Amino acid sequence: MERILEKVRAKSEIPVYDKSIENVLSAILTTNDFWKIVDLSEEPLPLVADIIRILEEEGLVKISNGIEFTEKGNEFIKSYGIGAKDNSVCECCEGRGVSLKNYQDLLERFKEIVKNRPMPKHEYDQGFVTPECTISRIALMNSRGDLFNKDVLVLGDDDLTSIALMLSNLPKKIVVVDIDDRLINFIKEVAEQLNYKNIEVITLDLRKPLPEKYSRAFDTFITDPPETVYAVKTFIGRGISALKGERRAGYFGITRRESSLDKWREIQRTLINDFNVVITDIIRNFNHYVNWGYEEETRAWKLAPVKKKPEDIWYKSYMFRIETLKDSRGFEEEVDVGDELYNDAESSTT
């Protein structure tokens, strides 16, 4: 194992541990599909690709239509006592911990409306979750007392959470901020069709600060930032600066597919030390992203050892809920970065 670890460290920019390699080996015991190996191992995709290449060099796996152990590889995993991944998840809620029993009508109406939604745009690192995930977000936020009669800010709305919020009739007011005019226009059209008046929709690149009128104006925000430290600080910082004060809430997703645990630690330090907020919830694989259709344009495709489009959902993120306290503060400065907003060594969907 030590030899493999050293070879991966020499090859990869991403922090790697023996546990990283064990996770990938365990995932390969479960599936030969590269995308599912990334999903099950919960290691950043570029690192998984590097590990698999080293395993191939060492004669432990063979790569053809899938990734499979050689005889030498099978002996190796037996000698280290590595078993297959056990992915036992509740079949009712898919591990989210919320019930959609009282939200079935909302779910069906949402599905119908978003059939004609704009498709994800690679330029903006877009991707959207399943309708069940979007409505589960509504259920989660409502269960925490963060929606009813509240002013809600949506920072980036690939998932059309604002439409689900309108259909729920729970918030007092909704404000949507997005860089993509296609999404902005679609949300406006739906608001007109629903005759929903309590919504504002603005086009803004979040590298720039929010308009001053949105400072300390909201009870709740939700966002789904790109997963560079720059982007996390910017998107979440903007959300915190828009909250009215203490004991207000923010929601966002962070993956293990594009963020190592080292990056998670940096993100959590930013949340706790810089923003002075409390992390109240982290729900594993809450968000399931529909395969976005531009896979062949991404870094993930270039790195994938098997050039085969994913057949199942593999890209998932953990849902974070944070809450502000007396000394919490956000981030309001303009960010002067380009591609670094979307890309770092662990990125793969850009």
UniProtKB/Swiss-Prot annotation:
EC number: 2.5.1.128
Localisation: Cytoplasm
Cross-referenced InterPro entries: BpsA, BpsA_C, rRNA_MeTrfase/Polyamine_Synth, SAM-dependent_MTases_sf, WH-like_DNA-bd_sf
Keyword Transferase recorded: yes
Involved pathway(s): Amine and polyamine biosynthesis
UniProt keyword list: Cytoplasm, Polyamine biosynthesis, Transferase
A GO MF label: transferase activity
Record's catalysed reaction(s): 2 S-adenosyl 3-(methylsulfanyl)propylamine + spermidine = N(4)-bis(aminopropyl)spermidine + 2 S-methyl-5'-thioadenosine + 2 H(+)
Positions of disulphide bridges: none
Family, similarity comment: Belongs to the branched-chain polyamine synthase family.
Protein name: N(4)-bis(aminopropyl)spermidine synthase
